[in-house]
Curated annotation (Swiss-Prot):
The family this protein is said to belong to: Belongs to the telombin family.
Gene Ontology terms: cellular component: chromosome, telomeric region; nuclear envelope
Protein's name according to its UniProt entry: Protection of telomeres homolog 1
Location within or outside the cell: Nucleus; Nucleus envelope; Chromosome, Telomere
Organism of provenance: Caenorhabditis elegans
Functional description taken from the UniProt entry: Telomeric DNA-binding protein, which binds to single-stranded C-rich repeat sequences, with high specificity to the 5'-GCCTAA-3' sequence. Repeat sequence binding can be at the 5' or 3' telomeric end. May have a role in protecting the 5' end of the C-rich strand of the telomere. Acts redundantly with pot-2 to negatively regulate telomerase-mediated telomere extension. Also regulates telomere length by the telomerase-independent telomere maintenance pathway called ALT (alternative lengthening of telomeres). Through sun-1, anchors telomeres to the nuclear envelope in embryos.
Chain's gene name: pot-1
Tissue distribution: Expressed in sperm and oocytes.
Entry keyword annotation includes DNA-binding: yes
Molecular function terms from GO: C-rich strand telomeric DNA binding; single-stranded telomeric DNA binding
């Protein structure tokens, strides 16, 4: 079979196998392959030689190589040859610096044939850099080639790893989005099965953050149902509704919970008048009391909530209408959480949970859901907020 040989500078990356000659000027052995830098009178190219499993190829510097049916690919804005011996007829022949044409030192295929161009190419390539190498010392060419190979491999590895991590991150975001969708896509009263515990960020219960987890909330009873609108009081003073301009008569303090999730945060704000606990850590709230009395109750509640709700985890969500918090007051209570079987419906009855560790928060349609998604905050409230939050998560996922 008559082969057509190209100069290295004329090699074109693509699926078509190509044939060429070159002189080895650098060798670097890898685990399952050999990287050689070969050159001709036009250019140089890196060649990755992948032998067969039972084959050993001993390359030496200044050998002249003839490569048949080699794949040329583009990598990092340069060309690279891949010679996988035996694949699609790929094979190579190598001659020593002073060997004869009929006596090659490396033969990767038993069916090799001599080409009419062998003699001419051997004479030409043997003259390249004939007197530049000094015995026993590495030349600057070797040092530079070694650095280039290591740099190319590092850049290739970095590019591959970045691409891999981007795919993993995208898959993770989609997974979290689906989990959030499942969390909110339930009617009030439905049971939600959680795959794992949703941790509450206890940093909100520090003294310096007390104003963030206990706040004053204004609810306009005139347009609340129509607009699903809830505002926080400024300086603890009720104001008029910005939609209907009517005075907001409903005024109460609220307990705000932040659930720790990797990519986004979900905030639940529950009016304290709706909290009922067997610990009796707060009294029934009187919405008709004046602001001074409300402030006194909030102060008492702050001191108790920092002790009772620290290190809490949400283990059961009954729709958006109720939460069950297990308060881990000591080491013994941690075993209660560890004994919960994942991926199953979690129903903690009063009989098997000590009353001193149980805090149940009943949430009416007044509940406020504050969703912080990719650094942006939306506030929803009322019984129809579930669909709005669901659409919000979908839209944010598409934009990302």
């Amino acid at each position: 079979m008559q082969y057509t040989y190209q100069h290295i500078q004329d090699l074109v990356p693509g699926p078509t196998p190509q044939n060429f000659y070159g002189k080895i000027i650098f060798i670097k052995k890898k685990i399952n392959q050999i990287v050689v830098l070969i050159k001709d009178e036009t250019q140089s190219i890196y060649l990755r030689v992948i032998p067969k499993e039972d084959q050993e190829l001993e390359f030496q510097l200044r050998q002249v190589v003839r490569v048949h049916r080699c794949k040329i690919q583009s990598i990092l804005n340069s060309k690279e040859g891949i010679a996988q011996i035996g694949l699609f007829g790929c094979h190579l022949i190598a001659w020593s610096q002073s060997g004869k044409v009929d006596n090659p030192v490396i033969i990767s295929s038993r069916s090799w044939t001599k080409s009419d161009e062998d003699s001419e190419r051997l004479q030409t390539l043997r003259k390249l850099g004939k007197s530049r190498r000094k015995s026993g010392r590495k030349t600057s060419v070797d040092t530079m080639a070694n650095k280039l190979i290591e740099r190319r491999e590092a850049m290739f590895a970095d590019t591959f790893i970045k691409s891999l991590f981007n795919k993993i991150a995208l898959s993770r975001k989609e997974h979290l989005s689906r989990n959030a969708r499942e969390l909110f896509y339930h009617r009030p009263g439905d049971i939600v099965e959680t795959q794992n515990l949703l941790e509450i960020d206890d940093s909100w219960f520090n003294d310096e953050n007390s104003e963030q987890f206990v706040q004053y909330v204004l609810n306009c009873t005139t347009c609340h149902v129509e607009y699903n609108h809830v505002e926080y009081a400024q300086n603890n003073i009720p104001t008029n509704c910005r939609f209907c301009q009517e005075a907001m008569e409903s005024f109460h303090a609220a307990f705000r919970i932040r659930i720790s999730i990797e990519t986004y945060g979900v905030f639940l704000t529950i009016p304290l008048e709706l909290i009922k606990t067997e610990l009796d850590i707060c009294e029934d709230w009187d919405s008709e009391s004046n602001i001074v009395e409300e402030e006194e109750k909030v102060t008492r509640f702050k001191k108790n909530i920092q002790e009772k709700v620290r290190d809490a985890s949400i283990v059961h969500i009954k729709g958006i209408s109720s939460l069950l918090l297990i308060i881990m007051l000591n080491i013994n209570s941690i075993s209660l959480v560890n004994n919960i079987t994942e991926n199953k419906r979690i129903l903690l009855q009063k009989s098997n949970v000590p009353s001193s560790l149980q805090l149940k928060i009943l949430i009416t349609p007044f509940v406020i859901v504050v969703v912080r998604f990719f650094g942006i905050t939306w506030i929803y409230s009322g019984s129809s907020c579930i669909e709005e939050v669901l659409n919000l998560i979908d839209n944010c996922s598409r934009r990302r």
